[in-house]
Amino acid sequence: MRCLPVFVILLLLIASTPSVDARAKTRDDMSLASFHDDAKRILQILQDRSGCCVIDSNCCG
């Protein structure tokens, strides 16, 4: 019974700590929007080079 107050205090302290990322952000971490921008840019380059739509094969014919 003597350990119960200590346990409760520890739980309250743990719950009140600020949440932080478990791992530091690295150079490889990219946002999802960045991937979408890269994909759009690559598709645009492919379309410009071939004069053909990459997504819609009907315009190539």
From Swiss-Prot:
Tissues with expression: Expressed by the venom duct.
Localization of this protein: Secreted
Post-translational modification: Contains 2 disulfide bonds that can be either 'C1-C3, C2-C4' or 'C1-C4, C2-C3', since these disulfide connectivities have been observed for conotoxins with cysteine framework V (for examples, see AC P0DQQ7 and AC P81755).
A Pfam family recorded for this sequence: Chi-conotoxin
Annotated propeptide span(s): 23-48
Domain of life: Eukaryota
Signal peptide range: 1-22
InterPro entries: T-conotoxin (IPR031565)
Gene Ontology, cellular component aspect: extracellular region
GO molecular function, one term: toxin activity
Major location (coarse): secreted
Modified positions (Cysteine amide) in chain numbering: 60
UniProt keyword terms in alphabetical order: Amidation, Cleavage on pair of basic residues, Disulfide bond, Secreted, Signal, Toxin
Record note on domains: The cysteine framework is V (CC-CC).
Similarity field: Belongs to the conotoxin T superfamily.
Protein name: Conotoxin Tx-D021
Upper lineage: Eukaryota, Metazoa, Spiralia, Lophotrochozoa, Mollusca
